[in-house]
């Protein structure tokens, strides 16, 4: 639970919301409709849960105008309750409290630059030429390679690895176990076996980017791998060398993006999507979960390729029939030709 406390009036001012009730009423956490107590703020973002307003014990309710009359307690009336909930969540997140200084167990090279108000946690390693911007926080066990640059107010949770030559903008948040700047999968075949292509590019990440845990973003072969401003990336995502992801795009868990793919701006890629290399995806393109993207997309829109779930016996029959499609196409062509003759 957060140690923060806010009055109805303070929250209304923060959101520029219409306030109804006791201006001095105080809450100290955010909770779901069903479990919220008198010390909690709750919210209604989906009308299908509107009936719960009648029994909710929340001290303050965040909701839209068309639902306001159905809650009799203290309330904040806004146009978009879900967006406002997101904004308030930062206020109640006590884990964001900042620290300053370098932990005694950290190793910081003499040629690295660390802002006075940054924090370097236990057992971190900062190599020569690295730059850590103002207000940036590194959790325990983070590694920052040579000449890597972090902007202001970044947050790296424990055990994040940034190889040499990586650049982060401002307000980049990276969760534990993520590796940025490892070698791309580049090898040239020869009679003697695979010959490694050393990856000479870097990774450039823009401002206000969030990256989940155990995600891997490879460095470029020659040019950089680029993640533009405002991109959000989930856990367990693999982004290969020289990929470019446009501003404002969202990549869900277990997505794999092959080398040199270009994802446009404001795209959404649902879980388990696989994107082929060396293709370009238009801005505002949306892929449903499990889609296998084998070619580029020139027109924005929603795309899907994975078959929906079926009862297993039906799926088996359809799988057999799928294997017979080519045979049936040839039979249909023969019948059509016979009719013409």
Swiss-Prot record:
It catalyses: a UDP-3-O-[(3R)-3-hydroxyacyl]-alpha-D-glucosamine + a (3R)-hydroxyacyl-[ACP] = a UDP-2-N,3-O-bis[(3R)-3-hydroxyacyl]-alpha-D-glucosamine + holo-[ACP] + H(+). Its EC number is 2.3.1.191. The active site is at 241 (proton acceptor). Pfam families: Hexapep, LpxD. Belongs to the transferase hexapeptide repeat family. LpxD subfamily. HAMAP family: LpxD. This is UDP-3-O-acylglucosamine N-acyltransferase.
């Amino acid at each position: 639970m957060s140690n923060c406390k806010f009055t109805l009036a303070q929250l209304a001012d923060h959101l520029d919301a219409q306030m109804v009730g006791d201006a001095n009423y105080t809450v100290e956490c955010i909770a779901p409709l069903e479990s919220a107590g008198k010390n909690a703020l709750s919210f209604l973002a989906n009308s299908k849960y509107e009936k719960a307003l009648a029994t909710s014990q929340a001290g303050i309710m965040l909701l839209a105008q068309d639902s306001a009359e159905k809650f009799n307690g203290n309330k904040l009336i806004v146009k978009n309750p879900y967006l406002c909930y997101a904004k308030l969540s930062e206020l109640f997140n006590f884990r964001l409290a900042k620290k300053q200084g370098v932990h005694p167990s950290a190793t910081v090279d003499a040629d690295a630059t660390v802002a006075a108000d940054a924090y370097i946690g236990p057992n971190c390693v900062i190599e020569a030429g690295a730059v850590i911007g103002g207000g940036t926080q590194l959790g325990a066990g983070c590694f920052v390679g040579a000449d890597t640059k972090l902007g202001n107010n970044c947050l790296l949770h424990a055990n994040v690895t940034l190889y040499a030559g990586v650049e982060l903008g401002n307000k980049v948040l990276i969760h534990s176990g993520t590796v940025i700047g490892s070698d791309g999968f580049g090898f040239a075949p020869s009679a003697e076996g695979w010959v490694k292509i050393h990856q000479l590019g870097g990774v450039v990440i823009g401002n206000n980017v969030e990256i989940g845990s155990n995600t891997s973003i490879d460095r470029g072969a020659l040019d950089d791998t680029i993640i533009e401003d405002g991109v959000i990336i989930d856990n367990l995502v693999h982004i290969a060398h020289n990929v470019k992801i446009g501003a404002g795009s969202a990549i869900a868990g277990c997505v794999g993006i092959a080398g040199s793919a270009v994802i446009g701006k404001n795209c959404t890629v649902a879980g388990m999507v696989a994107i082929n290399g060396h293709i370009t995806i238009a801005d505002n393109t949306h892929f449903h979960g499990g889609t296998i993207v084998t070619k580029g997309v020139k027109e924005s829109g929603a795309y899907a390729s994975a078959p929906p779930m079926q009862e297993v016996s039906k799926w088996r029959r359809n799988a057999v029939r799928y294997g017979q499609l080519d045979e049936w196409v040839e039979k249909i062509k023969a019948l059509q030709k016979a009719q013409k003759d």
